[in-house]
Amino acid sequence: MQQNQKIRIRLKAFDYRLIDQSAAEIVETAKRTGAIVKGPVPLPTRIQRFDVLRSPHVNKTSRDQFEIRTHQRLMDIVDPTDKTVDALMKLDLPAGVDVEIKLQ
């Protein structure tokens, strides 16, 4: 690969344990192939809250509150080798983790 190239990986998940486990797998794989890893950096957790009326007819003041928490991690792999890219492509991550990869 070219000099001064880096791979930016952004992970998103609803479960923080899954995202931490996936980040550890990615870091271990990249370090094993000789790349320099910066991160994982925890990004702010996005919290979506929903208020729903409990009653179908009256009692407007009685509501249920639900929330969805989206956890995010960011990591950079500096000067990746071809071995690093191949190892990351073969990596099997859990289904609940969204992986976004950018080459810079």
From Swiss-Prot:
It comes from the Bacteria. Pfam families: Ribosomal_S10. The keyword Transcription does not apply. Keywords: Ribonucleoprotein, Ribosomal protein. The keyword Ribonucleoprotein applies. GO terms for molecular function: structural constituent of ribosome; tRNA binding. GO terms for cellular component: ribonucleoprotein complex; ribosome. SUPFAM superfamilies: Ribosomal protein S10 (SSF54999). PANTHER family: 30S RIBOSOMAL PROTEIN S10 FAMILY MEMBER. Belongs to the universal ribosomal protein uS10 family. NCBIfam families: PRK00596.1, rpsJ_bact. Part of the 30S ribosomal subunit. Involved in the binding of tRNA to the ribosomes. This is Small ribosomal subunit protein uS10. It comes from Ralstonia nicotianae (strain ATCC BAA-1114 / GMI1000) (Ralstonia solanacearum). The gene is rpsJ.
